[in-house]
Regions:
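Residues that recognize and position ribonucleotide moieties
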Residues: 15-18, 45, 99-100, 145
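Short, positively charged
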Residues: 117-151
Length: 191
């Protein structure tokens, strides 16, 4: 999907609501740049893009350090991987693994509930994935592309009332729940 410069950042909408920068809808906390010295055989996992895509594996690094609440991640936190190959690494996730520490190149996204619900923000970010992918591709150097805080501040969209947000979430969550059930059935059949 290709966007011109205007529609890439000024998200079109038929919804009634207030137009505001995407950045204002959440707190965006980048993970830490862990070093080999931080790693140990046990402890909490360091969550990189590979873990978001493939789960905890023998390649996952662990640490026994304590790095603060702002980079500690729990089940159902919203995460946005903003750096890497635009086609494979730029994405939005509901965190589903064990508690861990957030690595660099991933934002922990905490909804600003004054404007949006957490679930609505998740679906908005998923909807914007093609925009994020093109933004990252437009900046791609040596295989890596980025979506920066400046991009999040530049992007604007219409935010509907909380009632409309809840109606949208009801429809999309029902579909997501069905997909999850089918995925679990497929996983059990494959096992």
């Amino acid at each position: 999907m290709k966007f011109d410069e205007s529609s890439l950042y000024n998200i079109k909408s038929d919804l009634d609501g207030i137009r505001c920068p995407l950045f204002d809808l959440a707190a965006w906390k980048n993970g830490l740049a862990f070093k080999k010295i931080d790693f140990s055989e046990t402890g909490r996992p360091v969550i990189k893009i590979a873990e978001l895509n493939n789960g905890i594996s023998s390649n996952t690094s662990f640490t026994q350090g304590d790095y603060g609440e702002d980079v500690y991640i729990r089940r159902d936190d919203l995460l946005f991987s903003w750096s890497g190959n635009p086609q494979t690494s730029i994405d939005v996730f509901r965190y589903r693994l064990q508690d861990g520490w957030l690595n660099q190149h991933i934002f922990k996204v905490t909804a600003n509930e004054e404007f949006v619900t957490k679930d609505f923000l998740y679906y908005v970010l998923k909807y914007l994935k093609p925009h994020f992918t093109q933004i990252a591709a437009n900046k791609q150097t040596t295989g890596l592309g980025h979506v920066t805080i400046a991009d999040l501040k530049r992007m604007s969209l219409v935010v509907p009332s909380k009632e409309v947000q809840e109606q949208i979430v009801l429809v999309l969550k029902a579909i997501d729940d069905k997909i999850e059930v089918n995925k679990n059935i497929n996983d059990n059949l494959a096992a």
